[in-house]
Design a protein with these regions (language model features):
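Glycine-rich loop at the start of a catalytic domain that most often binds anionic cofactors/ligands
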Residues: 2-7
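Basic, nucleic-acid-binding surfaces and adjacent catalytic neighborhoods in DNA/RNA-processing proteins
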Residues: 87-176
Length: 176
């Protein structure tokens, strides 16, 4: 997370780190360990149970052992389909099966298991297939789905289905 004051906070939350956003001074009742608090006049961001936290200056990020290896961030609006397509065609990645590749944060960062499954479903691709086995159209479609599914999920709090279908289902009383 980058801040306007010229620093970034790197935290590795594993599966158990958790952020809470609350009124300043209002701490949740939890058995977790408070690892970091960012406190303003009215609100606080509290990070519990993270395994690693570092404060970095922007010039330190490229040399960080984890951050320096990350691929393009799928949520970043400045990342283009062409960049993702270039990753799919890169010799480091084109021979790897899609199931493993989509979890490799050096390929494209920000994807996890459920996004991998959704991306492959929407693209109509099998997880054992490799980018070099796909035709140009399938690779271009995959690059599009990587960005579209990830960004929609981020913007909607996790919805990866067709938004029109979701709205129709909600209108019929289907719980979401």
């Amino acid at each position: 997370t980058r801040f306007d004051v010229g620093i970034a906070v790197y935290s590795h939350n594993q599966l158990y780190g958790k952020w809470y956003f609350r009124k300043a001074g209002n701490y949740p009742k939890t058995g977790r360990s408070l690892r970091m608090e960012l406190r303003g006049e009215k609100r606080s961001a509290l990070l519990y149970s993270a395994s690693e936290i570092e404060i970095l200056r922007p010039e330190e990020e490229p040399d960080h052992p984890y951050l320096g290896k990350l691929g393009p961030d799928a949520v970043d609006p400045d990342v283009t389909r062409a960049e993702v397509l270039a990753q799919l065609e890169d010799p480091r990645f084109r021979g790897r099966n899609l199931g493993a590749l989509l979890l490799d944060q050096s390929f494209v960062s920000g994807l996890g298991n459920y996004l991998r499954s959704e991306i492959l479903w929407w693209a109509g691709l099998h997880p054992s297939w490799r980018p070099k086995e796909l035709d140009d159209e399938d690779r271009e479609d995959l690059a599009r789905w990587i960005l579209d599914v990830t960004r929609q999920s981020y913007e909607t709090g996790g919805i990866t289905d067709c938004l029109e279908r979701v709205e129709d289902a909600k209108g019929r009383g289907v719980p979401f």
